[in-house]
């Protein structure tokens, strides 16, 4: 496929991480949803210090542009569904349970700076050849992965006559222990067999983006299990 065009965002998945950026295995550590408006990933860049060589007569003898420092992405998720499970995984705010043990709400508490989550997204790809693959398939998607997002925090919320949009902010970190991940997100062979990432991100990377023929998971309004990858070896 050449020059893919990105259409609308389809599906998002978040996964709970431990304080070292590793996926937490278990039944209540993932969440998949599609009821959101947008995800912004804004680069956080610190300008480098320029060096100017200036002679006594005022003439500039040389100039070296400072190298900017990329600190990561400032993440902003605008979403609609008030899911206690999603909010608990991304912010650390505890879930409020009903008489039957089902999640019915959440508490807003102190910022859990030691908590973290991974953020994955699938966006539709437009093109004449998105379904023209040897292994068949249902199309193609742009897949992006932020393997370590920290400092999840809910933003302002105003409830009135208009539709209510909630906002989650966070910041990425490099490194971590995502590895090749606990999920099958791309084709592992020419037959289109679903498999995990072929290689992990390097220690200085904050995001990975690629085209995949593996369809996103189905959205469900409840926790989803994290059982693949490192979980299989533990």
Residue ranges and their predicted role:
Residues 106-159:
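Short helix-loop boundary/capping segments
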Residues 4, 64-65, 156-157:
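Beta-strand-rich interaction surfaces with strong enrichment in secreted/lumenal proteins
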Residues 27-69, 85-103:
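Short N-terminal edge-element motif at the start of the domain
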Residues 65-125:
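Aromatic- and glycine-enriched beta-alpha-beta binding-site module
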Residues 23-28, 122-138, 182-202:
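Acidic Ser/Thr/Pro-rich low-complexity disordered segments
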Residues 56-58, 62-87, 162-176:
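Oligomerization/assembly interface segments of phage tail-like spikes and tubes
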Residues 1-47, 230-232:
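Polar/acidic, low-complexity leader/linker segments enriched in S/T/G and N/D
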Residues 145-234:
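Mixed-charge, glycine-accented linear interaction segment located at domain edges/termini
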């Amino acid at each position: 496929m050449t020059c893919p065009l990105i259409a609308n965002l389809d599906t998002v998945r978040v996964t709970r991480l431990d304080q070292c950026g590793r996926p937490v295995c278990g039944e209540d550590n993932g969440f998949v949803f599609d009821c959101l408006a947008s995800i912004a990933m804004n680069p956080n860049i610190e300008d480098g210090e320029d060096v100017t060589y200036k002679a006594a007569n005022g003439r500039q003898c040389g100039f070296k542009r400072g190298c900017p420092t990329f600190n990561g992405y400032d993440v902003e998720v605008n979403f609609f569904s008030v899911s206690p499970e999603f909010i608990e995984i991304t912010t650390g705010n505890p879930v409020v349970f009903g008489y039957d043990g089902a999640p019915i709400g959440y508490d807003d508490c102190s910022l859990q700076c030691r908590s973290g989550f991974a953020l994955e997204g699938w966006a539709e790809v437009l093109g004449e050849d998105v379904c023209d693959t040897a292994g068949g398939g249902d199309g193609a998607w742009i897949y992006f992965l932020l393997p370590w997002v920290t400092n999840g925090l809910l933003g302002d919320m105003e409830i009135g006559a208009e539709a209510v949009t909630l906002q989650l902010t966070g910041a990425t970190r490099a490194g971590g222990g995502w590895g090749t991940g606990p999920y099958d997100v791309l084709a592992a062979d020419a037959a289109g067999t679903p498999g995990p990432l072929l290689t992990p991100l390097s220690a200085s990377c904050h995001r990975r983006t690629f085209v995949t023929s593996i369809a996103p998971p189905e959205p469900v309004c409840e926790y989803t299990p994290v059982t693949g990858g490192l979980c299989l070896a533990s």
